[in-house]
Amino acid sequence: MNEDPAQQAMKVLAKYPLCDRCLGRLFAGLGRGLSNAERGRALKLSVVMSLHAMSLSGRLPENARDVLANAGGAAAQVYVELFGSPPEHRSCYICNDALDKFLDEMPQRVADAVKEWGGSTFLVGAKVDPGVIAREERIKAEFGLAFGESIKSEIKRELGKRAQQLGPKVSFDRPDVVVMVSFPDGSVSVQPRRLVVKGLYRRLRRDLQLRPREALSHPLVARLINDTRSSRVGIVGLVRDEKEVRALGLGIPVEFHLGGPRVRLVPPDGSIIEAEGASLEVNSSVEASGPEDLSRRVRVYRCVLYVEGGAFESLQLAAASLRGKEVRQKFMGKEVSGVVRGAECVDMGGGLAECIIALDERLHVMELVSGSGTEPSLSGLLGTAAECVVADLLGVIPLR
């Protein structure tokens, strides 16, 4: 539409009372460096001046009284001059005169919410009453206004800009918290971004298994939850923490994804978080892998084996024949396969041997030794029973 914006504004004001901000927002795409309130005020002044000029030339239009009354304070003096008394106040058709006050009061609440949740960066989201949106869209459609923006967009922009002046910084990519505000009721809710703590997991106790589904009861997880004041946790990279197997040496690369944190301070690299025999060495460069990456990670174990008959030479031969072989296992109803990457044994006497065994992460070392659901296995190749008396995980490393 080629009609002058002031002429369009006059037509809108002939029917609908609007505050400066809601009128200006209907023309938000026109002009630069203006707030919607400034834009609306300028349009109203242009309309008032045009009507005043018309009245002085004796050609005041019939709808002038409604236009001036709906323009509010910007037209008050001209209205009195033309009609002899001040106009009755008419509330904004779109926001019911609530938007300016909302934008003045909410920035502090947004900034306080960011601080309360331990954030330094934020993003504002907005929920607007459907009735408000419908009234705004009705005017745009009725008058063919093509340069407006939504009230939701204005609320997010204005609150973000004003709250940022109070301390926290806006981040569009990875905000610590998203602060959702509701207009016009003023309710606030916070959606904190999960906090990720990366590192190397170790445990010295054999009886302190970390099960992801029961993670909240584990002392190390409980400490992380307490330190960050989080409400939930997800663990990436801990494919399994085997019963009775200590995790030593290089440890297991893991990520703890802490949900709902109110403290967002991640301990510096090299820090050790300990709890009852379990620890996490914080390392932000750790790349934890999920179940889909099992074929690309290798578990290295130190195992003490007992072989019936004490035939150490036979054990050496069996271990050597396993190296580089693909092994199939049935474990808890699932079939898996992987490669034994290395197996070296040292005789300890008395039928015992210390072995270093490296195998793809999807394989289970206890079953590889005993032969339970496994083909080939050490026991199978020996032709006699072999048992893993004790085992320690020395590390989980990427396959090279």
Swiss-Prot record:
Q: In Gene Ontology terms, what is a biological process of this protein?
A: tRNA pseudouridine synthesis
A Pfam family matched in the record: Pus10_THUMP_arc
Looking up InterPro entries in the UniProt record yields:
Pus10 (IPR005912), Pus10_THUMP_arc (IPR055174)
Q: Where is the THUMP domain?
A: 77-194
Give the Enzyme Commission number. 5.4.99.25
Q: Which domain of life is it from?
A: Archaea
Catalytically driven reaction(s):
uridine(54) in tRNA = pseudouridine(54) in tRNA; uridine(55) in tRNA = pseudouridine(55) in tRNA
Annotated TM spans: none
- Could you give a GO molecular-function term held by this entry? tRNA pseudouridine(55) synthase activity
* Binding residues for substrate: 301
Function summary? Responsible for synthesis of pseudouridine from uracil-54 and uracil-55 in the psi GC loop of transfer RNAs.
Q: Which family does it belong to?
A: Belongs to the pseudouridine synthase Pus10 family.
- Protein name per UniProt: tRNA pseudouridine synthase Pus10
Q: Which gene encodes it?
A: pus10
